[in-house]
Amino acid sequence: MPRIFVPVPSEALWYVGSIMEAGAEPMVLGLPMDLPIGGVALRREWVADWAEVFCSSNELDALLLSAAEPAELAGLLIAALRLDLPAVVVPTEDPFSVALAALGFAPLLGDAAEIAVELARTGRPRPSELVEGFSLANALRAGLASGAGPELLVHLAAIAREAGVVGFPQMIRVLAPESPEVAGSSPFEANGAAGLVAHLGDALHDTLTVTGRLKGNLPSPVPAPQAAGPRLVFVRGRASGTEIVCRGDEGVTEISGDCHFCSSEEAAVRAVESGAVGTSNLLVVVGCGPRGGPGLFRLDRLGGALREADLNIPVLTDGLAPENAVGAWASLATPEATMGGVVGRLRDGDALRLDLTEGLVRTGAKADEIRSREPFPLPASSGLGYAARYAHATLPALEGAGFG
């Protein structure tokens, strides 16, 4: 009897009965609750290692995957890649699930449990057959069209690296600016995730999925989206090698302001709540990157504080913008502050302009002055455990922010 891995708590638990009815044995195990303190990439790596150990010691035939957070789901998928065990992702309506549908793992048609049991019996397709350059391009475009933010780039880069796909960071830089969020939900309302993927049209590659070829699972025709929404734009500092991912609404040409520098998310939240940040400020928040977090912090608390204060100001960080971020966010600043990046040498009052049209970083401070400033200090030791090992070995965000 085939054995199917089912993680809990997740929506996969609802499919246990269907797995048994299809003639397979569900192997239910709870996701780790005691995660190391850190950001989304650190949690992803922890879940990947945990799932790999469990699955490799339990003679499983396939995996039925679901999780509450994209980081956890990406970790489970990375474990499937390491073991090359057939995997099916339970489809949901969130942007990361739409990306995984375009990648080939979340079925656009059929019952996820029945598909997982069929894959367990046949052994195909395996994750190594699904993850390749064209399917990753599909996933990137579909995820961004459905409203995903920069976190999608990080997890897809980690999946690409695990699969041995070369050149994905360069693909991100080319395709992301060409892939705006769909403004208006007509494709999704008409046909769900399949409609949203189908609206990509000729940009979509007909890649292999858990239910056959991708285009064979799509409706045709689909309603055209109403308009182009926000998109991701890369800006760079030529001399410093700085690179920043900006979220730009249609028609916005720059992100600018006088810097208010904060050395952590906690400091930034305090500054917002105390009224120390004004409407002319650009809030700079550092120490949140892969090494500084450690693990790449998503600034959800700061996003909440800004909403509570009804303060619509731009934010620049070496971490991640919060989910459903509104306004101008510039994130994943690389090199991060703890790696000597320019973002860690900015100071209160510096005039900063991120030119979204030219793709350039412009500052009122001279380059020599910035270089002469004290760099952002290395974080205090994260101890001797998993987080410390991660902080020592982590890769940059657009390379997946995994272990190097």
Residue ranges and their predicted role:
Residues M1-P32, I37-R43, L73, A79-D84, ...:
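Catalytic or ion-coupling anion/metal-binding cores of large enzyme and transporter domains
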Residues V6-P7, C55-L76, V89:
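A short, small-residue-rich loop immediately preceding and capping a beta-strand
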Residues W46-N58:
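Short, well-structured alpha-helical segments in soluble
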